[in-house]
Swiss-Prot record:
GO terms for molecular function: alpha-1,4-glucan glucosyltransferase (ADP-glucose donor) activity; alpha-1,4-glucan glucosyltransferase (UDP-glucose donor) activity. InterPro entries: Glyco_trans_1, GS/SS, Starch_synth_cat_dom. It catalyses: [(1->4)-alpha-D-glucosyl](n) + ADP-alpha-D-glucose = [(1->4)-alpha-D-glucosyl](n+1) + ADP + H(+). Pfam families: Glyco_transf_5, Glycos_transf_1. Coiled coil: none annotated. Its EC number is 2.4.1.21. Transmembrane segments: none annotated. The lineage of its organism: Bacteria, Bacillati, Cyanobacteriota, Cyanophyceae, Synechococcales. Pathway: Glycan biosynthesis; glycogen biosynthesis. This is Glycogen synthase. It comes from Prochlorococcus marinus (strain MIT 9313). The keyword Glycosyltransferase applies. It is an enzyme of class 2 (transferase).
Length: 499
């Protein structure tokens, strides 16, 4: 199949959140299944210094009253064809923000649509988050291109309809209050980045005012779990670590722990319980819970805590105050450093993710891969990836808590600290996490099956995993809706052939 990925981010060149990881890692996994996969993204200014981009574009077009150019290069890590939409609006270094953010990404979506119609026509156009939300609307009447829309974070929903009407052409049939709603309505298939998140967003608690619409389209909604690149994230070959290690030999983690304590200005002690956190410092990630429980945890246990990330100023200030008040035991770096992040994964004893909501989460997968035991809230993708530790039967890979409350988080932390004191059991807990298979190869099979479904292919893909479908609403029949959607596609193709 010919598949075109359209997104605002693509790791490693442009990465702000988990979407960048998905767009950087899923396409090569699909390409290994013999699909022709290509990517298109805005031509941000910094890309011209990172990639080998020809001077001359392969095509020029016009949309929304502006001319644009399409440049062709290749992804630096996997070699897949990468197209960049060139326009002065993308020249600044910034990815998000600014008064023209809505216009920038609506323009990108429109340019991508023109590219798909005039230059390289895919069978499946895979769109990611609101930045590409208008593409399914414009493609709705094209019988030859099917659209898949992936929800990475429902909270960010794009410009409202009245603003879209001022910026671009909105088809007469378009419904939906904003870009995200329109994408959900008009995409041929919709998926969330974990099965649990797919169920959660159909409730009022997590639906961000779109739960009614999501229940309405539940027949074409499913959850497919994200993965990680097992070659890029391999503690046995990670050159950024002072000492490499694997599930059979964890001795290198002690060297990494000492290096982490030294770099973060903590007291060097191999027996201290060292907790790590690598995160955007925003409300979603539960940083406020950490601020509320830290003093009590440090008073009750011999723990140390390290935090790496940037975000909201108030949360940054609170973490900085804790570091000042607890020298040698609490340390924070208000930046992002990939080498330091890897050292935290490979040197900390446990990893903190007390998220308010979590569509999937990548950090807990990386932490387990590197032998850092996750302490997480039971929400979203964390439910699907971190089974709770059972000391009786010696099962599970992490410590989980239910309510978004300081007392619940604190209790989980104390439970993990007490388990850490039983080193043999703790080592087995680490090893279970390190041997979990969360590769993109497994996820790619699920996406391949969804592509076949949306294109009307009846035969299952070879060795395809069973794709779980969710009947998330009341009064809806998922199989019937899928059949109806495919029937409409076939009808449009037939009409086009008769014309």
């Amino acid at each position: 199949m010919r598949v075109l990925f359209a997104a605002a981010e693509c790791a490693p060149m442009v990465k702000v959140g988990g979407m960048g990881d998905v767009v950087g890692s899923l396409p090569p996994a699909l390409a290994k299944l013999d699909h022709d996969v290509r990517l298109i993204m805005p031509g941000y200014g910094k890309l011209w210094s990172l990639l080998d981009i020809p001077t001359d574009p392969i095509w020029r077009g016009q949309t929304m009253g502006n001319e644009f150019a399409i440049y062709e290069t290749s992804h630096p890590s996997n070699g897949l064809p990468l197209y960049l939409v060139g326009h002065p609006v993308f020249d600044p270094e910034r990815i998000y923000g600014g008064e023209d953010e809505d216009w920038r990404f609506t323009f990108f979506a429109s340019a991508t649509t023109e590219f798909a119609w005039n230059v390289w026509k895919p069978q499946v156009l895979h769109c990611h988050d609101w930045h590409t939300g208008m593409i399914p609307v414009w493609m709705h009447q094209d019988p030859e291109i099917s659209t898949v829309f992936t929800i990475h974070n429902l909270k960010y929903q794009g410009p409202w309809r009245w603003k879209l009407d001022r910026m671009t052409w909105c088809p007469w049939y378009m419904q939906g209050d904003h870009t995200m709603a329109a994408a959900l309505l008009y995409a041929d298939r919709v998926n969330a980045v974990s099965p649990t998140y797919a169920r959660e967003i159909c409730t009022s608690e997590y639906g961000e005012s779109l739960d009614g619409l999501l229940n309405y389209i539940s027949g074409k909604l499913r959850g497919i779990l994200n993965g990680i690149d097992l070659q890029d994230w391999d503690p046995g070959n990670d050159k950024s670590l002072p000492a490499t290690f694997n599930a059979d030999d964890l001795s290198g983690r002690a060297v990494n722990k000492q290096a982490l304590q030294q770099r973060m200005g903590l007291e060097v002690n191999p027996d201290t319980y060292l907790l790590g956190m690598v995160s955007r410092l925003v409300d979603q990630k539960g940083v406020d819970l950490l601020l509320q429980v830290t003093e009590r945890l440090l008073a009750y246990t011999d723990s140390q805590i390290v935090v790496l990330g940037t975000g909201e100023r108030g949360l940054e200030s609170g973490l900085w105050q804790l570091a000042i008040q607890n020298p040698g035991r609490f340390s924070v770096f208000l930046t992002y450093d990939d080498d330091l992040a890897r050292l935290i994964y490979g040197g900390s004893d446990a990893f903190l993710m007390p998220s308010r909501f979590e569509p999937c989460g990548i950090s807990q997968l990386l932490a387990m891969r590197y032998g850092s035991v996750p302490v997480v809230r039971k929400v979203g993708g964390l439910v699907d990836t971190v089974p709770s530790y059972d000391p009786i039967h010696q099962t599970g890979t992490g410590f989980c808590f239910d309510r978004f409350e300081p007392v619940d988080f604190y209790t989980a932390l104390v439970r993990s600290w007490e388990a850490f004191r039983h080193r043999d059991c703790w080592r087995e807990l680490q090893q279970r996490g390190m041997t979990q298979n969360y590769s993109w190869d497994r996820s790619a099979l699920d996406y391949e099956q969804m592509y076949r479904d949306v294109c009307g292919f009846k035969e299952p893909s070879p060795d395809a995993a069973v794709v779980e479908q969710f009947s998330l609403g009341q009064g809806s029949d998922p199989s019937r809706q899928n059949q109806d959607s495919n029937a409409k596609k076939r009808t449009r193709r037939k009409k086009k052939g008769n014309d």
